[in-house]
């Protein structure tokens, strides 16, 4: 449970969020809870899973940085995707739909080679 606890702690301590993770029950937050509930702890070893936030402070150089995006392109929390410097620090950007992925590619010109689309987990 060490890896899952690390991810949850980081999500809850993210000050760039308008509301703490523990107090938020939006779709993206609930999908993260569902993912953590059903995958074994070792699945998250060496992974820095970042939910809907492009805060530079959340990047961990020694881990694989995965930004999981559920927000739309106009949300303040993800505006750093417009920064090449920030995007270069990410290993993967995961989207919850093809539609959302296409909007981000158009808006931020993010590299498709760093992007993946998964369907909603719930």
Sequence positions of predicted segments:
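A conserved, positively charged/aromatic
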Residues: 80-91
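N-terminal pre-catalytic "stem/leader" segment of glycosyltransferase-like enzymes
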Residues: 1-54
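A short helix->loop->beta-strand "cap" motif at the edges of active sites that frequently abuts
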Residues: 62-64, 90-91, 112-114
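Active-site proximal beta-strand in glycosyltransferases
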Residues: 48-76, 94
